[in-house]
A protein has these predicted regions:
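Charge-biased, low-complexity intrinsically disordered regions
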Residues: 1-221
């Protein structure tokens, strides 16, 4: 897997650093131990954060700043990490999907980065390019139908968009049958050490909950 960061992104976020985790996995419908971790973190955040202070988490604040620089309102199109933590703080249940989706959500909540999880066998070609969404660019968000990604950072494969910090694409989404996983961590705050820690955390979660050796990761800028 090769990942290119376009000049469009470099111009609005010259310090961007990303990580790509790739692993062979076994997905399951539900994992109680994983949800125990998710719920424990939710309780911790309820003691330490509110819906305003969470916007100051480094990864979230930087992603919101990039949205504005690209012309997108981050209060209307919230980064997924912010939306997930906000839901927890409001006392709402997180949506339970399957172990891979739930695991990626936990990794995003724990570090504040918007993280995309993909079935790598559904990508077209072997290269992803991170750019900015165009006017009228077709994009079907998972469970959201067609969404307007103009001004959103977007990863594209040979066919089109596969992931934004707000919503990943139906075409390349993880499913219960996914065995070849790619996870992309978006460090718009430029904190390479924190991004690496997030990648290593994901590898540990995959070992614990997805019958995986954890795979490997690389940094891209």
């Amino acid at each position: 897997m090769k990942i290119i960061v376009s000049e469009e992104i470099e111009s609005v976020c010259p310090t961007f650093v990303g990580a790509c985790v790739e692993a062979n996995v076994v997905n399951t419908p539900y994992c109680q131990e994983l949800w125990d971790e998710i719920n424990a973190l939710g309780e911790k955040y309820k003691q330490t954060l509110n819906t305003e202070s969470l916007k100051e988490m480094s990864g979230i604040a930087a992603t919101r700043k990039v949205y504005r620089a690209c012309g997108k309102d981050p209060s209307r199109y919230r980064p997924a990490s912010e939306a997930l933590i906000r839901r927890m703080l409001q006392g709402k249940e997180l949506y339970q999907r399957d172990t891979l989706v739930d695991l990626v959500n936990l990794a995003s909540i724990a570090y504040g980065y918007s993280i995309g999880g993909f079935d790598a066998d559904k990508f077209e070609g072997d290269t992803l390019t991170l750019g900015v969404g165009k006017a009228n660019e077709p994009y079907e968000g998972i469970g959201r139908g067609m969404i307007n990604i103009e001004g959103l950072p977007v990863y594209r494969d040979k066919t089109g968009g596969v992931g934004t910090p707000t919503s990943d694409n139906e075409r390349t989404k993880m499913s219960i049958d996914t065995t070849h996983l790619v996870v992309l961590i978006n460090g718009y705050d430029g904190d390479e050490q924190h991004v690496r820690e997030n990648a290593e955390y994901i590898i540990q979660l995959l070992k614990k909950y997805c019958q995986s050796d954890g795979g490997s990761y690389f940094i891209y800028k």
